[in-house]
Amino acid sequence: MKFQLLTLVSIATTTLAINLEQVRLINDDELMVQDAQFDYPAIVNLKDQDAEIAKKTITSSSSTTTTTTAKKDKKTTSTTSASSTTTTSTKSNSTSPSSSSSKKHKSETASITKTGGADSVAAAAAVGGPILAALALLL
């Protein structure tokens, strides 16, 4: 009986955590069908949007050196850390190949929509967690 109740509560919590209101279909042409409730267009062509987005280059480098020397009673530790971050954002409307500042790269986007999945999981955990703990204490 306890296992059945735990299974039922687990399924109910999972159902609450999954956002069933938005249906996404991604096919070979990168077309995405979205729900109008989220104020997105019904069909979005990701390839066209990628062409319109400004190119962004983010370069980050970090180096850390740690040296530890231990003798009988003496221990010496030195730590050196250096970090630099360079962010460059360029927006280009021309597609001429003679431009020397343009870089050709293909970017891949997993999802461009804000589905609120993390918020729904956090809300379900905030509500379902204490309920599950209370049920566990009662059983």
UniProtKB/Swiss-Prot annotation:
The keyword Cell membrane applies. GO terms for cellular component: plasma membrane; side of membrane. The keyword Transcription regulation does not apply. Residues 57-69, 77-101 have a biased composition (Low complexity). Glycans are attached at residue 93. Residues 117-139 form a propeptide. It is a lipid-anchor; GPI-anchor. Residues 1-17 form the signal peptide. Its main location: membrane. Keywords: Cell membrane, Glycoprotein, GPI-anchor, Lipoprotein, Membrane, Signal. This is GPI-anchored protein 53. It comes from Candida albicans (strain SC5314 / ATCC MYA-2876) (Yeast). The gene is PGA53.
